[in-house]
C-alpha cells in the first residue's frame, strides 16, 4: 500500500518523549511493510529542545526519515511566525468557527501541498496523526482515511477545566472542551477508521461520536533502547521524566513538590528527587534552588541514566488522556513505579503486581517509604514491569497491530466503494 502519514510534528529523534516517540516508531514499523509518504508540520520549539539548532536538526531528521519514507516534506506553522502568534490565535478562536485545537494547524501552504500530493500520488490510506489535521480530510479524494487520537481532546480539555483554579482559564478551557466535543461529534464519523491508544479512549470517543469505526493501537516502547541496567541504583532516589511544557506533567510535578515532597522529606531522611524534562515551571526551579535534594534537570538528551539510577519511578499525573509513554519507558527499564491511577489509564498494569497506585499526598508518601524499605518487593515489581513491556508493548508487536488495522481499513473502503459503484450502474 501507499500510505500518507500526515503529522502535526516531525517524528524524530526516536529518543524523543511522548507522542513523538510513538509516531517515529509507528512510521518505521509501517515502512517495513508498506510505502510511507511523510508530510509533517515543524514545531520549531520541539526541534530546538531536542536537536539544538533547528535548521540543522531538520536536515538530520530529513536524512534519517528518508531511510524509511518514499517522500518527506516539512511544513511551517503560521502561528509560530511571531512571538504572540499562539496568543492571538487563541483569542481569535473564541469567536471563530473552529476551536483553537483545530485552528492551530490551518495553513494555506499545507492545503496547497496536500492538494499537490493528492493529485500526484494514488494513496491507498491517508493517515491523519491528530484531530487538529481533520480539516484537511476533504482534500484527499482517493484512499481510505484514518484518524489517530493520542488523547480524546474534548475529554482532556474538560478535565483540565474541572481542576483549573483560575476562573478565566477555567471558563476558557470549558468553552474549548465543549467546542471540541461538537467538532469531534461531526468530524470523527467521516473517517473510515479512528485509532485510539486504549479501550478506555475508545469508550470516550464513542460516547461523543457514537457512529465511529474505532480500533485500538496502544502506545508502545522500544524495549531494546529502554532496558534494565546502566549502573547501580541509588537506594533513596526517585525520578520523573516528561516534557514539562505539557500541562499534566507540570501539574503533576507541582502537586508532588508542594503536597508530597515536604511530608516525604520529614519521614525519609536522605531521599532525593530528579525531575527530568524541558521547560520546568518557575515554581519547581525555585524549589530546586532552596533544596539540593530536589533536582530539576531540565531537558537531557538521554533519560536512561537517570531512570536507571533511581530506586523508584514516581508518576503523579492526575490529568490528560491517552496513555502515558513515560510509564511504558519505566516499565521497560524494570523500574518499580508509584503512580496515580490516571497516569496508567490505557495500560494493562495491575495495582500491586507491576505498579503501585497512590492518589492522595499521604498515600504517595506511605507507598514510597514502604517500597524503599523493602528491596525484594521493589525488585519483584520491576521484574513484572519489564515482563509486561516485552510481551505487550514492544513496538514490533504494536507495529503489526497498526499494519493490520490500516490494511483492513483500506479493504473496507475498497469494498464500500465498489458496492457504491455497482449501485450507480
Model regions and ranges:
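Conserved catalytic-core segment of nucleotide-activated headgroup transferases in glycan assembly
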Residues: 207, 215-309
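Conserved nucleotide-sugar donor-binding subdomain of glycosyltransferases
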Residues: 75-135, 139-140, 168-190
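Acidic donor-binding loop of glycosyltransferase active sites
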Residues: 192, 293, 305-322, 333-336
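Conserved acidic donor-binding segment of nucleotide-sugar-dependent glycosyltransferases
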Residues: 355-362, 370-375
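A short, well-ordered alpha-helix in the C-terminal region of glycosyltransferases
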Residues: 377-392, 398-401
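Short hydrophobic beta-strand element within catalytic cores of glycosyltransferases
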Residues: 326-329, 336-340
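N-terminal subdomain of nucleotide-sugar transferases
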Residues: 1-73, 121
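Donor nucleotide-sugar binding/catalytic pocket of nucleotide-sugar-dependent glycosyltransferases
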Residues: 146, 154, 173-228
